[in-house]
Amino acid sequence: MSKARRWVIIVLSLAVLVMIGINMAEKDDTAQVVVNNNDPTYKSEHTDTLVYNPEGALSYRLIAQHVEYYSDQAVSWFTQPVLTTFDKDKIPTWSVKADKAKLTNDRMLYLYGHVEVNALVPDSQLRRITTDNAQINLVTQDVTSEDLVTLYGTTFNSSGLKMRGNLRSKNAELIEKVRTSYEIQNKQTQP
């Protein structure tokens, strides 16, 4: 090989290496996308969500005016949520309303502001529950509150702090500072 040919090959090889280096350097300078974890992953208006149990029966329905989902926390926030629970026969049993709600990945629904739980079946002795904040396990339908709770039944009203109950079994227990009033119906006998 002649000296001139060697020099041409060396110069061309160096030129190729320089071009590869420049190309690699340009790729490193690309702007990285900045993700703000305070922004929701997605937003939705006027949502209607139906959730079914593993057997395929309707478990609950969750309607909201506005929903924001945060994927980094696996949390959904609902504005003006209305939850309707269903029994095994697909009959609506309870309606739950609040100002805001947070649904976590473990299917816990945290309700905030003007929480109201209303019975939708006529045979329930417990007709309505009101409180400021509550938590509902959407799998077991256990409901709890650490705030002042008022229970309205067919023949009683009861209020107290801290409540534990279960929507499926239609019961609620007030834990502290309980005050109850009963309506006693007089039976009139005919002489």
Swiss-Prot record:
Cellular localization per UniProt:
Cell inner membrane
Topology relative to the lipid bilayer, per the entry, is:
Single-pass membrane protein
Gene3D superfamilies xref list: Lipopolysaccharide (LPS) transport protein A like domain
In terms of Pfam families, this protein maps to:
LptC
TM stretches of this protein = 7-25
GO cellular component, as recorded: membrane; outer membrane-bounded periplasmic space; plasma membrane; transporter complex
Concerning PANTHER family, the annotation shows: LIPOPOLYSACCHARIDE EXPORT SYSTEM PROTEIN LPTC
Family, as annotated: Belongs to the LptC family.
Which NCBIfam families does the protein's record reference?
LptC_YrbK, PRK10893.1
Q: What else is known?
A: Interacts with the LptBFG ABC transporter complex, but does not affect its ATPase activity.
Role description = Involved in the assembly of lipopolysaccharide (LPS). Required for the translocation of LPS from the inner membrane to the outer membrane. Facilitates the transfer of LPS from the inner membrane to the periplasmic protein LptA. Could be a docking site for LptA.
**Would you tell me the protein name for this molecule?**
Lipopolysaccharide export system protein LptC
The scientific name of the source species is Escherichia coli (strain K12)
